[in-house]
Regions:
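Noncatalytic modules at the cell exterior or secretory-pathway interfaces
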Residues: 334-344, 416-418, 494-513
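Low-complexity, Ser/Thr/Pro/Gly-rich disordered linker/stalk regions
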Residues: 121-250, 255-268, 322-394, 398-407, ...
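C-terminal interaction-tip segments
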Residues: 221-242, 313-316, 500-502, 508-528
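Beta-sandwich interaction modules
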Residues: 278-286, 290, 475-502
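Extended, low-complexity segments enriched in Ser/Thr/Gly and acidic residues that occur primarily
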Residues: 1-164, 370-426, 469
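Extended, solvent-exposed segments with strong compositional bias
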Residues: 451-491
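Localized edge beta-strand/strand-to-loop motifs within extracellular or lumenal beta-rich domains
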Residues: 287-303
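Short, aromatic/His-centered strand-loop micro-motif at the edge of beta-sheets
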Residues: 255-291
Length: 528
């Protein structure tokens, strides 16, 4: 029989069929009862699987690509081996029961954000903090920092820093900017140094976080600018030498500085090139306002992380590691109890005048600070046979003072308490001074192993800032004023770092009576 023309025959004729056929008389459809092998791709649109049971894909060539949505799957999906790639899912995914996931690496590496909503109480164990979210000892940064020092200078220069000007230069307080301008001329050696009147105590086991804000002069040849937690012997600071940026550790222990140039920083180099050495993609410009930070894990051999806070993020630029390092056989610097310092210096002749702006600083003990039980308690007082006779003209007379030894000017000493006892009934007034200078009397070492001297008979007050003033009642009662945390650090003994002059903690008294005698005592805590 001749093969018919398909366009002329309807329905088609089937030839050479060796399998059983079935005709659906109602529809006219013919079904072949056999397994059909399909060569090529079959595109399947949306498939709704509404029945319970298993979907068997065995025997097919993998991978199986499904385009479109698969909805209405109930039951188990088992026996999947290999990788499953799931494109982003929009909407909610409801999961009932346990989800067990096994993979081959530990710990898991997760990129991006994970948002989890817990409908019931659950135990969440988080460990292994790293980077800027943790402090220097690996603890998650939480909201319990203890502020040891801060300076804002909103309305006045509060005298928290000493200045040392060499050659042509000056320091100008700018009230409407709450900042200071450090200005130098062009001659070699012109410099302005600014350092706090006291160092800030490091407590072992606590991360010490320092933040300094500034704006350096545009870098130029022979102009060096520095900011950080340091003094002439030890410390951690950021430096621009006119050509390069550096992170520096100054060591009084080794007598050298470890200077790491920007292109060798082991964190984010802030070069703007992106990639592994600059994951933030940010470029550092020291001539713009910046927030420099350092967190110190001292213990003599700990790590120091330094960097900048930019757009609200702590960016670690470099980490100095000291434990278990080749060649390290002693502490990396003498102490971490150090002052805040700013410097601008001409290392040789400079083409034009320069200005660095000092803005704000803070020193924080992360994880709190326990003053009680720390250091050595000491005291000084008048002996019973030698009270102090007050003047009859109601003028204030110094009765007792303490100060740092000239050899221990970086010691941390906190006055904790004082007591005053009049010997007769009268009206007595007293004043407590910090940052005082007196004349006369004799300074006595508190002990051979103490950093403090006391004076039981100063003659006159030369200068000082009144920190407290009040009255003693007229019934021979004692008065005491224990200094409590966190206010205790406001009374820390200070010194002028560039002249080596120790400032005094001083008590003066006055009375309306005549020939009035008093006793006085002071207690303090020597932290370092």
């Amino acid at each position: 029989m001749a093969i018919p023309d398909p366009t002329q025959v309807a329905p088609w004729y089937l030839r050479n069929i060796n399998q059983a056929l079935e005709l659906d008389e109602a529809t006219g459809n013919v079904f072949i009862r056999t397994n059909a092998a399909i060569i090529g791709n079959v595109s399947v649109g949306n498939v709704a699987i509404g029945s319970l049971g298993n979907v068997d894909l065995t025997g097919n060539t993998l991978p199986v690509t499904v385009v479109g949505n698969i909805t209405g799957i109930t039951g188990n999906i088992a026996g999947i081996t290999g990788n499953v790639t799931i494109n982003p899912i929009t909407g909610n995914v409801g999961i009932v029961g346990n989800v067990n996931v096994t993979q081959g690496t530990s710990p898991w590496v997760v990129s991006g954000n994970i948002n989890a909503t817990l409908n019931n109480d659950a135990n969440v164990i988080i460990s292994g903090f790293s980077g800027a979210v943790s402090d220097a000892f690996g603890r998650l940064r939480v909201s319990n920092p203890f502020t040891l020092f801060d300076t804002q200078s909103r309305y006045y220069d509060h005298g928290q820093f000493a200045s040392n000007v060499t050659g042509t230069g000056n320091v100008v307080y700018v009230q409407n900017q709450s900042s200071y301008q450090l200005n130098v001329g062009t001659a070699s050696g012109d410099s302005v140094l600014r350092e706090t009147l006291k160092p800030f105590p490091y407590q072992p086991g606590k991360s010490q976080l320092t933040l300094n804000t500034f704006c350096m002069n545009t870098p130029k040849t022979n102009l060096r600018q520095r900011v950080g937690l340091f003094d002439a012997n030890d410390g951690v600071f950021f430096e621009n030498d006119g050509t390069y940026n550096y992170m520096v550790i100054r060591s009084g222990s080794y007598g050298v500085e470890e200077r790491v140039r920007q292109d060798a920083w082991n964190g984010d180099q802030l070069t703007g090139v992106g990639g592994a050495t600059n994951p933030s993609g940010i470029t550092l410009y020291p001539q713009r306002t910046q927030i420099y930070y350092a967190d110190v894990e001292w213990l003599g051999v700990g790590s120091v992380r330094v960097g900048f806070v930019i757009n609200g993020a702590y960016i670690i630029c470099h980490t100095f590691n000291h434990a278990n390092q080749p060649g390290n056989t002693k502490v990396y610097m003498t102490t971490a109890s150090l002052p805040i310092r700013y410097e601008i210096t001409n290392t040789a002749t400079v083409a034009s005048v320069s200005q660095m702006t000092q803005i704000c600083s803070s020193v924080i003990s992360e994880g709190g600070f326990q003053l009680s039980g720390s250091g050595n308690p000491r005291a000084a007082s008048h002996v019973l046979s030698t009270p102090v006779r007050l003047p009859n003209d109601q003028s204030f007379k110094p009765v007792i003072a303490i100060r740092l030894k000239s050899t221990n000017l970086n010691a941390v000493v906190i006055p904790m308490n004082y007591s005053l006892i009049p010997l007769a009934a009268s009206v007595f007034a007293f004043r407590v001074y910090k940052r005082a200078i007196t004349s006369g009397g004799t300074w006595v070492d508190s002990a051979a192993d103490s950093s403090v001297q006391y004076n039981l008979a100063p003659t006159a007050l030369v200068s000082g800032d009144i920190a407290e003033q009040s009255f003693v009642n007229s019934t021979n009662q004692t008065t005491g004023a224990p200094t409590q945390e966190p206010f205790s650090f406001e009374y820390q003994l200070e010194r002028e770092p560039f002249t080596g002059t120790p400032y005094e903690y001083l008590i003066t008294m006055a009375t309306t009576g005549t020939n009035q005698d008093v006793y006085a005592s002071v207690e303090w805590q020597e932290i370092t």
